[in-house]
């Protein structure tokens, strides 16, 4: 588990190993809010990830084939093509069906989570997110699970 800067960890080596596994993971962040995009970019770049930013679903669909991200964060409430439609289009494409899509929303309702699952999202993250929650979410999908490493 990642902790905030200056917090004690079980082992500094363990933390460094954890962060090194995130290094070079390519992450696409789709959000119409420049503040959210920039916050996510700062947190992810600090962890060594490569970050691709998109302002809306159409922008994301144009970039996904070129960049082939390992993980996609997708805001629900966006103009033109909302997050549900964007996620659905990504998951219907055989090339990107296996790419994890994490829905971002300022609402933490059961309906929003269920609707996200219905269009194929893999997880749901409530905004505002913390650095730790963002990196742990990426790690969930990028790092091998304990069963794969045993």
Where are these regions (language model features)?
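Charged docking surfaces used in two-component/phosphorelay signaling
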Residues: 38-46
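Short hydrophobic/Thr-rich beta-strand motif most characteristic of the beta2 strand and flanking loop
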Residues: 48-55, 63
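Active-site beta3 strand of CheY-like receiver
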Residues: 67-73
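Receiver (REC) domain active-site loop signature in two-component systems and cognate sites
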Residues: 78
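C-terminal output helix
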Residues: 129-138
């Amino acid at each position: 588990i990642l902790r905030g800067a200056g917090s004690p960890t079980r082992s500094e080596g363990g933390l460094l190993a954890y962060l090194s596994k995130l290094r070079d993971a390519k992450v696409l962040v789709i959000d119409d809010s420049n503040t959210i995009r920039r916050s996510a970019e700062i947190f992810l770049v600090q962890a060594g990830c490569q970050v691709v930013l998109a302002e809306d679903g159409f922008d994301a669909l144009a970039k996904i084939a070129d960049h082939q991200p390992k993980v996609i964060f997708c805001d629900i409430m966006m103009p033109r093509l909302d997050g549900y439609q964007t996620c659905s289009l990504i998951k219907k494409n055989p090339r990107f069906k296996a790419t994890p899509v994490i829905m971002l929303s300022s609402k933490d309702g059961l309906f929003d989570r269920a609707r996200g699952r219905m269009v194929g999202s893999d997880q749901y993250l409530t905004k505002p997110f913390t650095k730790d929650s963002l990196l742990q979410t990426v790690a969930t999908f990028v790092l091998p699970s304990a069963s794969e490493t045993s």
